[in-house]
């Protein structure tokens, strides 16, 4: 998308191009890494690069991932929530709509299951951590696959998904077990069987320290370019920064965005792109 993540690609590149065009040689080396697969767990992207060429990176590096931000450019992301994507496949018995007693309606069972899981999660895991925006764990039913193509058929299979972004101190295994309990209750009451799969499961690595050199470098550059005080924060979204952090490499996520990623009419503003390039140039120069 134009914001997610072409804006970060272009702004980081043009910050470096400005130095080259002006004949400025920085005091330290600068590297840009462009990786694939970020939306699908980075198995063929940064994860592969870190495994195959981990020698490219050092804990002393200033690692910036331009993949999240705020409209005023003052949010520096230093932490991400744990998370998992859950898939529920509900099996019942298909039949004609005129004789529902001969079938087991998986859509009705799925609706009950979604409501039960949603209510349980959002009333059990209510802690807040003001480092993060939003400050609570989020548990959202999202995708629903098509079942029967016509109105007069009772569906015998339904598939739906949850997207869960969980504050780091919670135990994902415990949450998974409680979800299974809700599944078992609804299955016993409705006669369906349920296959519960993990599409992905990521425990949050340790946050990048607030006083790390990369955070301080961004704070100085943002103050110079925007005359604003930046602040370290956490987000619910996932970026490739977590893979750096898992390797003990302190990374910061930063850009100036209106948070239109994955939305209809996703956009980035040219003034933001130019300002971000200026911030990157200041960081490259060690200012």
Task: Describe the role of every protein-language-model region.
Residues 3-79:
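Acidic/histidine-rich catalytic neighborhood of metal-dependent amide-processing enzymes
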Residues 68-73, 78, 84-287:
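Metal-dependent amide/peptide-bond hydrolase catalytic core
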């Amino acid at each position: 998308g134009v914001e997610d993540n072409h804006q970060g690609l272009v702004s980081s590149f043009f910050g470096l191009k400005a130095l080259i065009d002006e004949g400025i040689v920085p005091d330290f080396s600068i590297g840009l890494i462009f990786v694939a697969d970020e939306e699908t767990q980075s198995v063929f992207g940064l994860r592969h690069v870190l495994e195959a060429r981990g020698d490219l990176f050092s804990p002393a590096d200033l690692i910036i991932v331009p993949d999240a931000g705020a409209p005023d450019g003052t949010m520096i992301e230093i932490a991400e929530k744990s998370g998992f994507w859950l898939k529920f496949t509900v099996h019942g018995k298909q039949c004609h709509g005129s004789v529902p007693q001969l079938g087991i309606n998986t859509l009705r069972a799925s609706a009950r299951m979604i409501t039960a899981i949603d209510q349980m999660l959002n009333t059990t895991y209510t802690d807040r951590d003001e480092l993060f925006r939003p400050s609570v764990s989020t548990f959202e039913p999202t995708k629903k696959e098509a079942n029967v193509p016509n109105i007069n058929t009772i569906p015998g299979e339904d598939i739906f998904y949850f997207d869960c972004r969980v504050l780091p101190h919670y135990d994902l295994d415990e949450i998974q077990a409680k979800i299974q309990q809700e599944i078992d209750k609804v299955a016993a009451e409705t006669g369906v069987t349920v296959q519960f799969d993990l599409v992905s499961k990521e425990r949050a690595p340790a946050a990048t320290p607030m006083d790390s050199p990369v955070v301080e470098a961004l704070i100085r550059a943002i103050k110079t370019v925007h005359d604003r005080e930046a602040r370290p924060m956490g987000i619910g979204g996932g970026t490739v920064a977590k893979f750096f952090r898992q390797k003990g490499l302190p990374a910061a996520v930063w850009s100036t965005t209106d948070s239109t990623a994955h939305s209809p009419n996703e956009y980035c503003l040219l003034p933001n792109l130019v300002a971000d390039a200026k911030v990157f140039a200041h960081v490259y120069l060690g200012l």
